[in-house]
Amino acid sequence: MSENVFLPTENLVMGAKDDSKPMEYCYNFKWGSTGTADGQFLRPHDVSFDSDGYVYISDRDRNDIQKFSANGTFIMKWGSEGNKAGQFSVPYSIEIDSMDNIYVVDRGNDRIQKFDVNGTFIQQWDRPKNVNETDQEFASPEDMVVDRKTGNMYITDTGNERIVKLDSNFSYILEWGSDDGNPSNARGKFNHPHGIDVDSKGYVYVNELENPRIQKFDENGKFIMQWGSEGKGPGQFTPLLEHLEIDSNQDRIFMVDGALNPRIQVFNSDGNFTTSFGTQGNGDGEFSKPEHVNIDSSGNVYVVDRGNQRMQVFSSC
């Protein structure tokens, strides 16, 4: 990672604050510990929910997916290390569509796998299904999102420094980002695209592991704006930025600020900072190397507290 990061100032919001009254978040409960037994974690990475409120968590070192009730009771698990159908090599992100199909970004195998809610394998893709060119193969994909209004999918194809848009049948629509597979700090380009989500209006938000910013695009990949700079103040980010998630009820953007400044920042859809919560530690409401966040239908915020090998849940207060 380069030591100096240049961000263009045009369309850049530098830690602006929202004047409306912010929603605050307080610790509610937690579960998990270190280990390989049911309900334990080695390196938890992402969390997602199905329509019945069940919670699914990927674990990069266990190479499995665990399913829990909303209060953290273990239900079942599936997966093991390997490259066969239903196996994983560093499973990163989990995305669940409106039909409760579960998509797992199998980063180490450069593919996306699809399952039902019982962990039954359905199919897999290592590239959009309507293209055969080797340069369209995924390279270390890390995150994906399904637009629940259109069914279209967006994937952070990280090794290729691009975003790939697919339809609900996994057919190629378009892509944007790098033209040559190399990283770039220019607007509309990427330096290790990491997290991605879509708001209620169809705008796409992307954060990068090696750039302290969030970029906003329309559904066709047209650059709209960006915000962020390096630092620890409101609206600033530290290097090794983790993943963003959008609360679909109010389009609030939750950004995990990673290992160097473990906190969750919250923004509105214009990039204005509203609040933050969390600090370094292993107590309730504290984080060590948080990686992912998600918001359930009741507004509860689930944080993957990877360094503490646990899930923490926060509620508005």
Model-derived regions: residue spans:
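Sec-dependent, cleavable N-terminal signal peptides
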Residues: 1-3
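Eukaryotic scaffold repeat domains enriched in small/polar residues
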Residues: 6, 16-317
